[in-house]
Amino acid sequence: MIKVNVFLLDVGSTFIKYMVYEPSLKAELFSDSVPFPMPLINDGVHYEISEEEIRKIIYRIFNTASEKECKSAFICAQMHGYLLRRHNTFGNYISWRDNRGDTSNYRLTNVDFSESGTAIKKNSPLASLCTYEESILAESEFFTLGSYISFLLTGKNITHKTDACASGFFNSCTLEKYDFFDNLVLPSVLDKVEMIGKYRGIDIYAPMGDHQISFLGSGAEKKNAYLLNIGTATQISTLA
């Protein structure tokens, strides 16, 4: 029997958890976790984390995946956070705990977000970006945490719809982009969990949103089923 080690990564808000799984044996061969970096800025409104610290951890973890001879990697990441890349330089990671968003901004007041898959709140990336100057956004590229990890590993700003739609920039049914900001570059979005590239011989699959994955893993398939997910933040949700 040929063993095919699969690497599973969950980038949470308190811990980053990872494991090596062997499907034919249905066995966990290795697992570990590291704390998610502490914020550089946490003043009650702004919550920013060093991009460099996140990058170092991701590369260190995937070096472990390579050492464990993993053939493929599946990733889920905390939703609603983002990074901006301007002039080839990344800014800090703006966490979902950040509350700088301008929900009353004129761009958002006449838009029906019912098909975006998210509600616009002060911690929403879309509302947060309304506080930036247009000239800055016109020179920037937007990344979810998931698409940022894709970029580190494959050079592509790409992610799965369960991660991308939490930003508020995409219609969750059609994946159509909402063009709120001129020239702001957005991630490419995949409808299916597909391989997007390789890192050190490992097939990297499009990252997914962690809350969406918790629902999938629960096995709840009926529309009248509710899921209580207790993590760093707690959510209660049902299928639409």
At which residue positions do the language-model features occur?
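N-terminal glycine/serine-rich phosphate-binding loop of ATP-dependent small-molecule kinases
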Residues: 1-91, 202-206
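Residue-level marker for buried hydrophobic side chains located in beta-strands
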Residues: 7, 95, 160, 207, ...
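Short beta-strand segments
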Residues: 10, 74-77, 144-146, 207-208, ...
